[in-house]
Design a protein with these regions (language model features):
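Basic, Lys/Arg-enriched alpha-helical interface segments
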Residues: 1-89, 95-116
Length: 116
């Protein structure tokens, strides 16, 4: 829910995907990423809103493996992907094709220990 003084997110352009938080912790992590890496995070926003499954740069953007590769969001099992914002900073997200929404499930300023 938007609050006075809160950040305003642009609506998606025609053909683009909408980005939403799938977890409260992701919203907190997103704000930290905004402070630490605003330029690379804006690039991530642009890429994810255009094509969340873009495979142009697989070292930066790829589907997570094994148990991390799917996640339940709103009662649906969705693919879970990772976008490398910087060397250590990551975003995990789940695209929902039926509503063209990318759910941000993790936004981390450090390398997620789950992938070690």
């Amino acid at each position: 829910m938007a609050k006075r003084g809160g950040r305003v997110a642009p609506p998606p352009r025609r053909g683009e995907w909408e980005l939403r938080f799938g977890e409260s912790e992701a919203a907190t992590g997103w704000e930290e990423l905004c402070r630490q890496a605003p330029g690379p995070l804006r690039e991530a926003w642009d890429v994810l809103s255009r094509d969340p499954r873009d495979r142009t740069n697989p070292s930066r953007q790829h589907r997570l493996r094994s148990d991390l590769g799917t996640r339940a969001i709103r009662g649906k099992m969705l693919e879970q992907w990772q976008y490398e914002v910087t060397g250590a900073e990551r975003i995990w997200f789940c695209p929902d094709d039926s509503i063209r929404v990318v759910f941000i499930t993790k936004a981390s300023t450090g390398h997620p220990s789950e992938t070690d």
